[in-house]
Amino acid sequence: MRHDDSELKDLGGGSTRRVLAWNEQLMSVEVAFETGAEGKPHSHPHTQCSYVVSGRFRYTVNDETAELGPGDSVVVPGGAVHGTVCVEGPGVLLDIFTPMREDFLA
């Protein structure tokens, strides 16, 4: 799938999401943030890997918080409460989910 052929979804609060590619087992998603934009704490049954493409993020998984920059990554186990704040933007995360997030296609 070509990047510009996928839908850009405005998530509000200074962030957008673009589903890049997927099948039943795997999904890649680009999430862009303005400085101060937040991915509020949440959980889901999917395992997630977040890779920082650009910007700096304060990323929390359960009770552990780390500041991540370009080239850094974090794995979020299914069911873990996690969230992030872009502390230096614009920032972009590449999120990989297994299995795919069907809710992102609705």
Segments and roles (model prediction):
Residues M1-V29, A106:
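A short, N-terminal "cap"/entry segment at the start of jelly-roll beta-barrel domains
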Residues Q25, C49, E64-T65, V81, ...:
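A short, glycine- and basic residue-enriched loop/turn
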Residues V29-S43:
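Conserved short histidine dyad/triad with adjacent acidic residue
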Residues G39-P41, Y59-T60, V76, H82-E88:
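Short beta-strand His + acidic residue motifs that chelate non-heme Fe in jelly-roll/DSBH
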Residues E64-G78:
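Short acidic-glycine-tyrosine-enriched beta hairpin
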